[in-house]
Amino acid sequence: MAEAPASPVPLSPLEVELDPEFEPQSRPRSCTWPLQRPELQASPAKPSGETAADSMIPEEDDDEDDEDGGGRASSAMVIGGGVSSTLGSGLLLEDSAMLLAPGGQDLGSGPASAAGALSGGTPTQLQPQQPLPQPQPGAAGGSGQPRKCSSRRNAWGNLSYADLITRAIESSPDKRLTLSQIYEWMVRCVPYFKDKGDSNSSAGWKNSIRHNLSLHSRFMRVQNEGTGKSSWWIINPDGGKSGKAPRRRAVSMDNSNKYTKSRGRAAKKKAALQAAPESADDSPSQLSKWPGSPTSRSSDELDAWTDFRSRTNSNASTVSGRLSPILASTELDDVQDDDGPLSPMLYSSSASLSPSVSKPCTVELPRLTDMAGTMNLNDGLAENLMDDLLDNIALPPSQPSPPGGLMQRGSSFPYTAKSSGLGSPTGSFNSTVFGPSSLNSLRQSPMQTIQENRPATFSSVSHYGNQTLQDLLASDSLSHSDVMMTQSDPLMSQASTAVSAQNARRNVMLRNDPMMSFAAQPTQGSLVNQNLLHHQHQTQGALGGSRALSNSVSNMGLSDSSSLGSAKHQQQSPASQSMQTLSDSLSGSSLYSASANLPVMGHDKFPSDLDLDMFNGSLECDMESIIRSELMDADGLDFNFDSLISTQNVVGLNVGNFTGAKQASSQSWVPG
């Protein structure tokens, strides 16, 4: 230690470490400088264990203090180095004890007293040959009372940031300082910060100042009355504790004073809830106890929540419920195997969508197709009447069940004459409508499917031969059609309000008077109604007072397929022509396409128009005479349904559900 610098200049840490008199083995301290080492405490010739520990531990701290200006501990550090080495431990320990007693522990040594008075920078002669300088410009030594253990807590001494801030605030005349003023005080009064006032070197300690101000309860921020000025920081008269207060989290909703009361109430409530087992079982957190919280797990709240979920899981949201019209199309597959749909809503969709034409109807399609197949309608039969009826039926164009061809595209069910193929694009199409099978095809609307999926068709189930309307009515298809007509309105009303209203009006009119029903139908604007009205007028003229609807139906259903076809052509010729223009405008191709395009009109109107009750009165009609007299006159009617007939799926309304295979079902409704 003789080589140790004897000048009063403080030793740099590097010089102390490189001093050959120091032995590293004697100071095995790593990251434990605040702690006392038992071996140092037990070292001999030490006035007290405390002093011994201090003499050893502060050694490197002395290096820091020489930089920092921490006066008290610097001497102890340097002394500690001497103790560990060849220096006389007795003198060094005594000197260290004197130097480590700043202010409070004045052992009588001038340097120690000076250090306690913030001026303990005078070098101390530890040995005659080694005067160790104790330049302690550190005012930090005087800024706070030394702890029982003289080892420094911080580079500037034992005072914490909170202590320094407290000193700064208390030193002000108003007992309040702004943040910038606190910074200034630190730089001015604490030697350690004197050279650390610039922006680069002050970032760290200024940040610590801010943290201590906000995290310690001893400080309070008071809004500054001046505009644009920073807040005042004062000593909290209530919560200020001497020394460093326990660390707490930044002010937030959880620990802010503003929420302390509410937090206390919440804690009490939580304890009470936990005391009650029924409510506390499922409440891990007090947040779950909030009554409006969906995360609530209390028994009553959980029940309410699950009830809400159960309500949302009603049948309306399930495919099996059959209660949601939105899911009707998806539910049709399930209905195929059933006798009939449980709810008309499934088939209430518009004719364009007409779920009735979809799979649920397909169950009955084979029967209808069989009936249509039984009908041998000549290819030359008028298609106009068929198109009109089909338009009213608004059923998607059905594919021909028999090989004959598509007899009725407008109807949801295929109405094909078993006769030589599709037949003439114009003639065969309409004739099938009025053939016995044509009555079957008249209406296979969602209403029919709703009613047991039986075609509420008006087709006479009778054979191709001329048959009276009575035969047709006697057939099962007619009975089903009657049921459908009677029940179609309420079912359709469920399916669609507009359709139900129209059907109700039509049914009432039809039941009251076929003439009125047909008259009302044109007002409704259905193509089929107009066509039927024209047919009825024609048929009534020929029949002489027989019900127009019954006549038209009888003409269509009872006459020979060929004669019926021509009669249908003729009957529909006036109406079909007028309707053809409308249908052409709608579908751009033909009455049939119009019917396909306007399936809603068809499936609303035609079945209701063809209420079988009307046929009870005048079933006996000379269909041949009527056909010859009136219907045959309209042979010149030119309606091109080639595209519609040739393509079973011509109209977008054509639902793929009605395929020829489905039409090929063995069930036949033809009575004879």
Swiss-Prot record:
<dbReference type="GO" id="GO:0033209">
    <property type="term" value="P:tumor necrosis factor-mediated signaling pathway"/>
</dbReference>
<dbReference type="GO" id="GO:0045665">
    <property type="term" value="P:negative regulation of neuron differentiation"/>
</dbReference>
<keyword id="KW-0832">Ubl conjugation</keyword>
<keyword id="KW-0472">Membrane</keyword>
<dbReference type="GO" id="GO:0097192">
    <property type="term" value="P:extrinsic apoptotic signaling pathway in absence of ligand"/>
</dbReference>
<feature type="compositionally biased region" description="Basic residues">
    <location>
        <begin position="260"/>
        <end position="271"/>
    </location>
</feature>
<feature type="short sequence motif" description="Nuclear localization signal">
    <location>
        <begin position="241"/>
        <end position="258"/>
    </location>
</feature>
<feature type="modified residue" description="Phosphoserine">
    <location>
        <position position="310"/>
    </location>
</feature>
<dbReference type="GO" id="GO:0005654">
    <property type="term" value="C:nucleoplasm"/>
</dbReference>
<feature type="region of interest" description="Disordered">
    <location>
        <begin position="399"/>
        <end position="441"/>
    </location>
</feature>
<dbReference type="GO" id="GO:1904646">
    <property type="term" value="P:cellular response to amyloid-beta"/>
</dbReference>
<dbReference type="GO" id="GO:0009410">
    <property type="term" value="P:response to xenobiotic stimulus"/>
</dbReference>
<keyword id="KW-0597">Phosphoprotein</keyword>
<dbReference type="GO" id="GO:0070542">
    <property type="term" value="P:response to fatty acid"/>
</dbReference>
<dbReference type="GO" id="GO:0042594">
    <property type="term" value="P:response to starvation"/>
</dbReference>
<dbReference type="GO" id="GO:0003677">
    <property type="term" value="F:DNA binding"/>
</dbReference>
<keyword id="KW-0539">Nucleus</keyword>
<dbReference type="GO" id="GO:0006417">
    <property type="term" value="P:regulation of translation"/>
</dbReference>
<feature type="modified residue" description="Phosphoserine">
    <location>
        <position position="283"/>
    </location>
</feature>
<dbReference type="GO" id="GO:0001547">
    <property type="term" value="P:antral ovarian follicle growth"/>
</dbReference>
<feature type="modified residue" description="Phosphoserine; by IKKB">
    <location>
        <position position="643"/>
    </location>
</feature>
<dbReference type="GO" id="GO:0005741">
    <property type="term" value="C:mitochondrial outer membrane"/>
</dbReference>
<dbReference type="GO" id="GO:0097150">
    <property type="term" value="P:neuronal stem cell population maintenance"/>
</dbReference>
<feature type="modified residue" description="Phosphoserine">
    <location>
        <position position="420"/>
    </location>
</feature>
<feature type="modified residue" description="Phosphoserine">
    <location>
        <position position="293"/>
    </location>
</feature>
<dbReference type="GO" id="GO:0010508">
    <property type="term" value="P:positive regulation of autophagy"/>
</dbReference>
<keyword id="KW-0238">DNA-binding</keyword>
<feature type="modified residue" description="N6-methyllysine">
    <location>
        <position position="148"/>
    </location>
</feature>
<feature type="modified residue" description="Phosphoserine">
    <location>
        <position position="208"/>
    </location>
</feature>
<dbReference type="GO" id="GO:0042149">
    <property type="term" value="P:cellular response to glucose starvation"/>
</dbReference>
<dbReference type="GO" id="GO:0005759">
    <property type="term" value="C:mitochondrial matrix"/>
</dbReference>
<dbReference type="InterPro" id="IPR001766">
    <property type="entry name" value="Fork_head_dom"/>
</dbReference>
<feature type="modified residue" description="Phosphoserine">
    <location>
        <position position="30"/>
    </location>
</feature>
<dbReference type="GO" id="GO:1990090">
    <property type="term" value="P:cellular response to nerve growth factor stimulus"/>
</dbReference>
<feature type="compositionally biased region" description="Low complexity">
    <location>
        <begin position="110"/>
        <end position="129"/>
    </location>
</feature>
<dbReference type="GO" id="GO:1990785">
    <property type="term" value="P:response to water-immersion restraint stress"/>
</dbReference>
<dbReference type="InterPro" id="IPR036390">
    <property type="entry name" value="WH_DNA-bd_sf"/>
</dbReference>
<keyword id="KW-1000">Mitochondrion outer membrane</keyword>
<feature type="compositionally biased region" description="Polar residues">
    <location>
        <begin position="282"/>
        <end position="297"/>
    </location>
</feature>
<dbReference type="GO" id="GO:0034599">
    <property type="term" value="P:cellular response to oxidative stress"/>
</dbReference>
<feature type="modified residue" description="Phosphothreonine">
    <location>
        <position position="32"/>
    </location>
</feature>
<feature type="modified residue" description="Phosphoserine; by SGK1">
    <location>
        <position position="314"/>
    </location>
</feature>
